[in-house]
Amino acid sequence: SSVTGTGTELKFRTGGDQGTYYGFGSVLAQAITTNGNGTKVTAVVSNGSQDNIEQMQMNVAQLGFVQSDVMSYAYNGERLFEGFPYADFSTVAALYMEQVQIVTCDPDIKSVADLEGKTVSIGASGSGVYYNALDILAAYDLTEDDINAQYQDFGASADALQDGKIDAAFVVAGAPTVAITTLATAKDTYLVGLDDEHIAKLQESSPYYEEYIIPEGTYE
C-alpha cells in the first residue's frame, strides 16, 4: 500500500477526538477496511470541516467529513476560503443532518431577536459555527457587534451556560448533542427557534440551510 494514500491506504479526516465526527468516522473507517476488498481506511483526528478540506487539497488525506455550508465556501472561494477557491473534490455521501441549535438557560430568551445585548457564544472565530451564527443573526438584522460575543467550543459553552457566565450559545451538531444533554441534566435548558418569516429570509441568502424541527423530548 502507499503511504501517500494513492493506492489502497486512505486517510479519513474526521474531527476532534471527543466529537461525533471522530467516533462516527472511526466506525466507518473500520467498516470500509473490513469490507473494502483490500482498501485500508484510517480515521484521523482533525480540527473539523475547514481543516479537512485543506488537508485533502494537499493530499494529506483522501476522505473527510465536511459540513455542506463549509463545502459551499470552499467551492465558491468565500468566507473561510476567501480568495482561495477549492473545487477539486466530490461528494461521496450525505450522512446526516446537523442542526444549528441555539441554547439558553434563560426562559425569557424566546427569539433570536432577544439575543441583542446578551452574552452569546458563537463558536471559534472563523469556524463553521461562527458563520452559522452570523447568518442567523443577520436574518434578524443583528450583527456580531449587537451581542457580547464569546468564542467557545461546545463543552466550554455548556459549562459557561451552567455557571451563568453567558446567556446563550450556538451549537452546530446532530441532536441530541452530548454537551446539551449534560447541561440539561443540571439546569433547565431551552432551545430557541426561528419563525417562518426569518427562516425564509435565511434561506434566501444562504440556500444550504433547511428547516428542521428538533423532536420534543430530545433533551429529556
Enumerate the predicted regions with their spans.
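Residues that cap or initiate secondary-structure elements
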Residues: 18, 49, 69-70, 108, ...
